[in-house]
Amino acid sequence: MKAVILISGNGSNLQSIIDNADRIDLQISCVISNNKNAFGLKRAESAKLQTAIIDPELYNSKEAFDRELISIIQQHGVELIVLAGYMRVLTPLFVSHYFGKILNIHPSLLPKFPGLNTHQRAIDASETAHGVSVHFVT
């Protein structure tokens, strides 16, 4: 299966995907980041993967940004888009365009602890169980 991975930061989930891509029959066509300083871009480059950076500050709206993101993704003819630490909320335009093809990795057992700092919030709440959610974006 051909996929594009979207990242914003360290890329630890990206690295796990890279390390297991052959095992799960996944071809990573491109890694796209909205953050030019994302360490995940270095991980992608080390794995000899194509990368792209889209700076949100260059666009006057979230929809304009997502239109550019769609344009780049369309060049790769992918079947799957993986949000691996991607820290932007996708617009309805993007979600409807790729409905059923967007997989999100979230570091908590949703619906508990959406958003940032999930691990610390779980510790602060004295949770006895904590994990990860992987779900299709709707």
Q: What function would you assign to each model-found segment?
A:
Residues 20, 26, 84-138:
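Donor/substrate-binding cores of folate-linked one-carbon enzymes
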Residues 47-48, 98:
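Short, structured coil segments at secondary-structure junctions
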Residues 64-72:
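Charged helix-capping and loop-helix junction motifs
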Residues 33-34, 58, 62, 76-92:
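N-terminal glycine-rich "phosphate-gripper" loop used for MgATP/nucleotide binding
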Residues 29, 79, 100:
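Conserved acidic residues
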Residues 1-39:
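N-terminal Rossmann-like dinucleotide-binding module
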Residues 52-57, 105:
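Short beta->alpha connector loops at strand-helix junctions that form conserved
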